Regions:
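Conserved donor NDP-sugar-binding/catalytic core segment of glycosyltransferases
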Residues: 2-36
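Conserved hydrophobic/aromatic beta-strand scaffold that supports enzyme active sites
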Residues: 6, 67-69, 115
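Active-site donor/metal-binding and catalytic loop motifs
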Residues: 14, 109-126
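Short aromatic-enriched loop/helix-cap "lid" or pocket-rim segments at secondary-structure transitions
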Residues: 18-23, 121, 127-130
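A recurrent flexible, glycine/aromatic-enriched loop bordering the glycosyltransferase active site
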Residues: 35-70
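Intrinsic low-complexity, glycine/proline- and repeat-rich
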Residues: 43-44, 48, 140-158
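A short, conserved alpha-helix in the catalytic core of glycosyltransferases
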Residues: 62-63, 67-79, 86-105, 110
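Catalytic core of nucleotide-sugar-dependent glycosyltransferases
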Residues: 112-113, 126-150
Length: 158
């Protein structure tokens, strides 16, 4: 990452069994041939492919803050995550939408920045309609700063 540019890596999902093995062994190696992987192509690590496929994007598709990097000043510029989000869903996309709305550039790091996501039960998605509406509003109105964000916590520390 650099100021004015956030980077997005790829994510490989581990099955419950692969996660249990990884946690039990502690010293293990994962790659495209490992058992129990979803999104297997994301496990490919290649300098050549990285050079060919890493590119700038203005899309929200595939935004996952589990493997995401940016500068603190860029976070503060948009007031961080919107604390009004409840439950699972869309907070990552809404955060990235405000970054893009503010002129911060996205760069996808294909085949180089790989995160292995441990299995866990899925969270309740009952708040998804409200979260979808909040994301749609941010996109439609080109919102840059959320009202209830990180500023609230920074003020409390003073």
């Amino acid at each position: 990452a650099k100021k004015g540019c956030f980077v997005q890596g790829s994510r490989v999902l581990l099955s419950k069994e692969a996660t249990e093995h990884a946690l039990r062994e502690q010293n293990f190696e994962l790659n495209i041939f490992s058992k129990g992987l979803k999104n297997r192509k994301n496990a490919i690590h290649s300098t050549l492919l990285k050079t060919l496929f890493s590119k700038k994007s203005d899309s929200l598709k595939g935004v996952r803050t589990c493997n995401f990097a940016l500068f603190r000043s860029d976070i503060l510029q948009i007031n961080g995550f919107d604390n009004r989000f409840v439950g699972w869903g869309r907070e990552d996309s809404e955060f990235a939408a405000r970054l893009l709305n503010s002129g911060i550039v996205r760069k996808d790091l294909k085949f180089s920045a790989i995160a292995y996501h441990l299995y866990h039960p899925e969270s309740n998605r009952s708040s998804l309609p409200e979260n979808d509406a909040r994301l749609a509003e941010t996109i439609e109105r080109k919102i840059v700063r959320c009202e209830d964000g990180i500023d609230r916590f920074l003020k409390e520390q003073r």
